[in-house]
């Protein structure tokens, strides 16, 4: 999640985003999602990914090659309790269909070693972004989910989320085919467990989230599968130390084994309740379509 560090500069940032090229109707993203791009005419490689932020996040090396000038608005990207700090500047970026101006963020640590930067569907100029994950198969269903940004001052710079109803309240869903496991923040896991009968099991593992930062994760199994569009599943990972806690919030009639915690607490900060659908579940899906004018994400899965 991107957070600003200078709220007073927000109005200036909005003014700097004028002059973008007329958007094309649709962009198709397939394969590894990596495309040749330029920033201020300087070449690099950027990955367009469903879970990427609208503000391109690139390496300091690329920003320096492009002689980007940092503005007064810095940012930080929260990965659990850790933060990656960066700088921003406005420059023309070309993803292969013509240049447009965009505020660009850069960090010393790369978001991914696979490319010089990443960008999400909210940051490309096309109205519709179609991610092709694999060849369609018989029996697939397409379900449209409403979408939202992360909200707050940096809402227009962050990720685009799908929304589902969980216990009468919205739960934010992101789609990340570049990470193996489906993961929930601790507060999201608490809500899911309360609604679906969840139990934490097994040992803590370290899982890379972004920027090479690893966070502790345990496995949760559900008595009643969770539905996200055409997907149903009963197993997911829980980021036990991130945005909430799974410790000390159990509510069960029977004694609780230390390695099996029944989580029933409700989150007090719903904005931090996020579920990231990983490659383990997206392997069932052939495409994800972000339709920005319709404010929909359409997920097609078997």
What is the meaning of each model-derived region?
Residues 1-11:
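Bacterial N-terminal signal peptides that target proteins for export
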């Amino acid at each position: 999640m991107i957070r600003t560090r200078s709220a007073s500069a927000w109005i200036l940032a909005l003014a700097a985003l004028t002059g973008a090229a007329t958007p094309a109707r649709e962009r198709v993203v397939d394969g590894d999602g990596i495309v040749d791009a330029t920033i201020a005419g300087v070449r690099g490689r950027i990955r367009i990914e469903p879970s990427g932020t609208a503000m391109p996040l690139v390496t300091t090396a690329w920003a320096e090659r492009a002689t980007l000038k940092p503005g007064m608005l810095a940012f930080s990207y929260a990965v659990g309790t850790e933060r990656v700090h960066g700088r921003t500047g406005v420059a023309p970026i070309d993803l292969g269909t013509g240049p447009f101006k965009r505020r660009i963020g850069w960090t010393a640590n790369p978001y991914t070693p696979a490319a010089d930067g990443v960008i999400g569907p909210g940051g490309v100029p096309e109205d519709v972004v179609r991610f092709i994950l694999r060849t369609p198969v018989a029996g697939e269903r397409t379900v449209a989910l409403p979408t939202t940004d992360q909200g707050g001052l940096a809402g227009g710079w962050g990720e685009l989320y799908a929304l589902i109803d969980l216990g009468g309240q919205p739960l934010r869903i992101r789609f990340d085919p570049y990470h193996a496991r489906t993961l929930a923040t601790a507060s999201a896991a608490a809500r899911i467990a309360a609604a679906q009968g969840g139990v934490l099991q097994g040992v803590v593992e370290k899982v890379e989230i972004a920027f090479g930062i690893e966070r502790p994760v345990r496995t949760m199994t559900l008595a009643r599968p969770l539905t996200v569009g055409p997907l149903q599943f009963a197993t997911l990972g829980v980021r036990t130390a991130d945005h909430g806690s799974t410790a000390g919030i159990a509510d069960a009639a029977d004694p609780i084994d230390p390695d099996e915690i029944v989580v029933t607490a409700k989150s007090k900060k719903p904005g931090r309740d996020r579920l990231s659908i990983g490659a383990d579940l997206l392997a069932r899906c052939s495409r994800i379509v972000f339709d920005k004018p319709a404010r929909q994400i359409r997920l097609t899965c078997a």
